[in-house]
Amino acid sequence: MHSNPKRLNLLQGIALIISSTLMLGVRAQELPLVDADTISPHPFPAFTPNGSVYQPGESLSYTFQFGLIHAAQADISVTEVSPSQHGPSWEILVEGRTTGAFKWIFKVEDVYRSTIDAASGLPLHFHRDIHEGGYELRQDYAFDWTRNTVHSHRKKGDQDSVIATYLLPQTSHDMVSALYALRNVKWDQIQQGDTTGIPLFMDEEWFELKLVHQGIKSIKMDGKKYECIVIQPVIQTGRIWKKSNDLVVYVTNDSSHIPLYAETRILFGKIRMELTHAEGLRIPNSFGH
């Protein structure tokens, strides 16, 4: 029995957009890996740590809708781990999976784990284990900020492992720590229409993820109204997206900056991400406690 290429592309696209929407892992501008002469201590001052708005014990849950179909679910939790040589550390765990009838059509089980320095928010270790249909990938990164390097171990399916070491700017993030670094940004100090950026290391490449502040907007979820900051990642067009502004993320316009809702138009429809549960918030708001 032959599979339908069109359907397979659709399902692979949904798996990709679920991952991309949640992680904000979308390439804005790919750049070559930097050499030591180009590294500066804080190339992106907006992301210099200014006091964390999250804490161990926080957990967030999201659902993903493709049209009227409940396609997937993701859970994020923050826990305290044993202190390392760097001092107190936190682990951010992200687990995503397709749900309901959709998982029988295209099964997705993804795990992302980032261990970060509690003081700076910078990543120390990153683990990614994804299973999407017949595609499997495992990645492990070890960050060494005394040398501004990341040691990468990548294994795809049954292929041999690829091990390499890369130079990075000091404030680089993995795809999970980047999501939480965004929450610590003082968005009230960034003007509507302005663009900020964060250096991101993903898939053995370093690039700058650009984000446009699109202003303040109120949205309604489950009969409640929430005031949100609208953030637009500048995404790469082509395989999934038609336009570079086809992904919009809404974060709460309070001190927590929780990603509340995201919407993206792709080549074959629209996908929505909604926060369904929040607890253990460091700064309680109208959604969580």
Name the predicted role of every residue range:
Residues 2, 29-30:
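N-terminal acidic, proline/glycine-rich, low-complexity intrinsically disordered segments
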Residues 2-14:
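Bacterial N-terminal signal peptides that target proteins for export
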Residues 4-5, 20-21, 53:
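Compositionally biased regions
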Residues 12-22:
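Bacterial N-terminal signal peptides
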Residues 24-28:
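Sec/Tat signal peptide C-region and signal peptidase I cleavage site
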Residues 30-145, 184-289:
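Acidic, serine/threonine-rich low-complexity disordered tracts
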Residues 139-179, 183:
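Hydrophobic, well-structured mid-protein blocks that either form specific transmembrane helices
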